[in-house]
């Protein structure tokens, strides 16, 4: 049987296929996907995976914040695309929308994975925040669960930083990108950002997508920053030191929540910055704990694993109810 997971990432749409023991992956840049037609999206899936659309048993989609629903469900039963609003924290390119619509408007069986928000089944104290994490992070967490870990924290560190806590195989809480630890591009609004928004110098969303550690440096993007860090340039290392410090704080805060459930769990680091050895070592030192690392494909692979297990009849994923078929 053939299952596909789709990770709506910050910079790319990543696809993973699971067929028995075989795992295949490919990605489309978000701008690249936005420029394609729905037919071209489906053709790319067929070409890259060497399959026909009719061979796919189930696709698990993630889209944007996923804050308009709280159970995994048939994508065609969603109101709109499963969002409370298209406005929010992040840059809009249209690539995720094109992929979502291509699958929904096809004959492929498909489910949508929700994000975690105030309507989700998490520790009630976390519901002070309206939104906790977008759907693809559940893909990462489910992949870790499939690896055999039931109690863990996973911090996805890249353009932004998002951290989830899982106890006994269920998500109990998460800290979203706009709340605490900054990433390279995105971060929480500080005092000056709030003043800028109030003075109408920028929108809140613009402030969010410019609040990462890149603003501390002369570099234009994540790739340039990481390249400079590899050369030992001080501004780049300071930016990574800052990310590592706040990511460690965020992980520790999730472990504090987990203590109420009798565990602190294994720590996993994911994302393009979480994969950097320099950052990993800093975080491990801050936490005085070893951390395990995941690659950039694990969100999509985890979504494919969700599709596989939902197809087999599973009615709960990480504590999230399944309303399918």
Curated annotation (Swiss-Prot):
The lineage of its organism: Archaea, Methanobacteriati, Methanobacteriota, Stenosarchaea group, Methanomicrobia. It comes from Methanosarcina acetivorans (strain ATCC 35395 / DSM 2834 / JCM 12185 / C2A). This is UPF0285 protein MA_3856. Belongs to the UPF0285 family.
């Amino acid at each position: 049987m053939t299952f596909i997971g789709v990770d709506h990432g910050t910079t790319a749409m990543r696809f993973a296929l699971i067929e028995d023991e075989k795992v295949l992956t490919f990605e489309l840049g978000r701008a690249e996907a936005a420029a394609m037609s729905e037919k071209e999206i489906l053709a790319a899936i067929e070409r890259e995976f060497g399959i026909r659309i009719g061979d796919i048993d189930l696709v698990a989609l993630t889209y944007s914040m996923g804050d308009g629903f709280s159970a995994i469900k048939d994508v065609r039963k969603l109101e709109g695309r499963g969002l409370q609003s298209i406005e929010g924290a992040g840059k809009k390119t249209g690539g995720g929308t094109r992929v979502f619509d291509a699958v929904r408007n096809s004959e492929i069986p498909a489910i949508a994975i929700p994000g975690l928000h105030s309507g989700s089944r998490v520790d009630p104290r976390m519901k002070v925040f309206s939104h906790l994490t977008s759907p693809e992070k559940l893909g990462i967490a489910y992949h870790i669960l499939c690896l055999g870990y039931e109690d863990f924290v996973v911090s996805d560190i890249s353009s932004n930083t998002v951290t989830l806590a899982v106890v006994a195989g269920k998500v109990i809480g998460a800290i979203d990108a706009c709340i605490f630890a900054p990433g390279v591009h995105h971060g929480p609004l500080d005092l000056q950002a709030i003043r800028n928004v109030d003075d109408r110098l920028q929108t809140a969303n613009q402030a969010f997508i410019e609040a990462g550690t890149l603003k501390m440096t002369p570099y234009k993007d994540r790739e340039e920053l990481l390249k400079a860090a590899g050369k030992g340039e001080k501004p780049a290392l300071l930016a990574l030191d800052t990310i590592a410090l706040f990511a460690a704080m965020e992980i520790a805060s999730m472990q504090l929540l987990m203590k109420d459930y009798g565990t602190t769990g294994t720590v996993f680091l994911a994302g393009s910055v979480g994969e950097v050895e320099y950052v990993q070592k800093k975080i491990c030192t801050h936490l005085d704990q070893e951390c395990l690392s995941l690659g950039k494909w694990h969100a999509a692979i985890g979504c494919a694993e969700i599709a596989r297990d939902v197809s087999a009849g599973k009615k709960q994923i990480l504590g999230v109810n399944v309303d399918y078929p």
